Structures are given as structure tokens and as C-alpha cells.
């Protein structure tokens, strides 16, 4: 899930704001971190939900909150949940006159070149290749690999455990956009016992690499019909990388959980969204497929394709433009009730 690189220059350090706190974690001999926002009127007595929000390729933890979702902390206050935003591995791809910030997650598909069972490579022979992350040094990732090689599944698991040890948590949800959606998808497969629901926004896995959980987990996948970065139907992206069709992903999960009932609906908000909900599944699992017939590669309610390629004061050590204010008028209020009702 690669978007064109953003040209950036060194920015001065900023004073941290109090809206989010930055929490360091020592994981696999590295200091990694996440940002956390606690809702207003939080008490130790009442259990609250935890939502892990995962940024996309070239994104940041704060960019996911500020721009990608158009103010996710406001939704945390409205719905009363704790929001945590992990930061993925990043590096600066240096040119002669510039350097560009690159970040990604090891979603277990983008760090591989070939799919199993002789299904071929995840990109075309003439597809562009992308500079590899330092975590992939010494690993035979192949020419098509573009993502991090860190144990990001374990990192996110650590974040969930850490927050549950310090807060009174009721339910846990993992959501992500693009490469972050792929990461949420992978986490659902690896640790379904830790989450009550997963929301994957425009983050379909690479062709032939769709995973299926072995334990029950509720799942929502959202895609934009006109998305040419992670296409939900046409398989081939603009840069000639291959992605699993949305229908295949939901059908494989539906079969795995033996879902017997399907309800279809067309939701007409600002755009027409084709909704499918699968229920009467094993272990009361629910699966939801949402296809925005006019949407592209953005979070619902956001029009800017570059939203999230920024940082806030909490991440002033990252050389990236400051985030601007984006107001999401309908997307978060469309997705979150569906997620919390799984």
C-alpha cells in the first residue's frame, strides 16, 4: 500500500500539547511508543472500551487522529472510549535536495514477495520497487516487499496488555486505515482472543495472502469502489501490486465461521454504501462488508487523499508538516456504532 512520497524538510521542535500523552515501550530491544487519549470524565470505577487506531503507509500516529479520521479524539470523548495510536517503524528516504518520510507496519503480507502455493509474486514483473526498511536487512523479503519486518503484531499486543494493566477496560477494538487496516486484519488473525471487534478501512491483504482466524472474532471491512491504491475489485493497483478482492476476503471468513444469514442494505449518506451483514455464525460472530460505491482510498467522511501525512506536537521529533484541522462530518459516526454493536 504505497502512496507517492512526500517531500519534507527539517522542522523545529514544538512544545507537546496535553491532548494526547506519549508512552514509550521497550519492545525487542527497541524503544517504541504510542499516543494515548483518555475521554473526558474518565473514572477508575467505570470500565471503558479501548480502541487501537493504526495509521497507514507514510502516516503517523498523530496524523491518524488529526487528519486520517478527522479528529478521532473527539469521537473518543463522544463515545467514551480510550484511544491509543501506535507509531510504526519509519525512516527517511534521502534524495539530493530532500528527504522523504516513510513509515509502515509488518502486516505479514507487505513484507513478503511471494504468496504461498505457487500463487506468484505480489507485484507485476514491471512494478516499481520500494526501499526496504532496516528491520528487513538480512532477510530474504524479495523485490516486491515494501513494509516493515518488525514484530508489529507483538508490539500492538503489548500495548493492549499495558493499557489493560493500568486502566479499567471493558472491550477492545482494533481499527486501521490502509496499511493500518492490513495490520488490524493481521492482528485479528493472530490474536482474536484479545479483541472484541476489528475494523479494516481500505486495507485488503495482498493477493493470495488473506488470513483467516482460527478463533471467533467480529470483523468489519470497508472499501472504496474507486480505490486504485488498494483496489477492492480490480485486484491490480496503480503501481501494479496485487490485492485480494474484497468479496473473496469476506467469503473466506464467512465460510470459516459458517455464517448462515445475510442482510443487504444500501445506505445513502453523502455516498451510496452497499452494506452486507453476515450473522448466525459460529460463536455468534458477525461480519460486515461496506463498499462505498463512490469512495476512494480515504477514511469515510474524509476527502483528502493525503490526509494523515503529518504530525502533531506530540511527535515533533518527526520531520513532517504539522497536521491541519479536518472535520469529519459523518464517517466516524457511521463506522463506530457498527463496530461497537458487533
Give residue spans per PLM region.
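Serine-hydrolase catalytic machinery in alpha/beta-hydrolase-like enzymes
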Residues: 27-35, 45-173, 186, 190, ...
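The feature captures the conserved acid-bearing segment of alpha/beta-hydrolase catalytic domains
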Residues: 70, 77, 196-284, 291-296
